[in-house]
From Swiss-Prot:
GO terms for biological process: iron-sulfur cluster assembly. This is Iron-sulfur cluster insertion protein ErpA. Required for insertion of 4Fe-4S clusters for at least IspG. SUPFAM superfamilies: HesB-like domain. It comes from Shewanella denitrificans (strain OS217 / ATCC BAA-1090 / DSM 15013). Iron-sulfur cluster binds at residues 44, 108, 110. The keyword Transport does not apply. One of its GO terms (molecular function) is 4 iron, 4 sulfur cluster binding. Its cofactor is iron-sulfur cluster. Belongs to the HesB/IscA family.
Length: 116
């Protein structure tokens, strides 16, 4: 498990996302939960983002801690997310976690899938 400071991170975890995760974890009353972000094959553009809560992390996972919560990314997914940002938005269209990914050459309309 690799933990780094804000300046040295290959991926960013915004305050908005961290605050939302913190609120969700307080509701669950499970301090072991972490937000896991991953990339899988699929979606309309070739790859898709996934978000889940996970109690475990592997020794080779990349971990960012902010606002007292942890974001976890496996090494395979991290290569597609370098330079990106995990954020959270809430608006008329609903609320969701999302990834701003500079490596994506195209994305689908919903923003859940991308190609490189």
């Amino acid at each position: 498990m690799t933990e780094q400071t804000d300046a040295a991170m290959p991926i960013k975890f915004t305050d908005a996302a961290a605050i939302k995760v913190k609120g969700l974890l307080e509701e669950e009353q499970n301090p072991e939960l972490k937000l896991r972000v991953y990339v899988t094959g699929g979606g309309c553009s070739g790859f898709q983002y996934g978000f889940t809560f996970d109690e475990k992390s592997s020794a080779d996972d990349f971990v960012i801690e902010k606002q007292g919560v942890k974001l976890v990314v496996d090494p395979m997914s991290l290569q597609y997310l370098v330079g990106g940002e995990v954020d959270y938005t809430s608006g008329l269209e609903g609320s969701r976690f999302f990834v701003k990914n500079p490596n994506a050459s195209s994305t689908c309309g919903c923003g859940a899938s991308f190609s490189v």
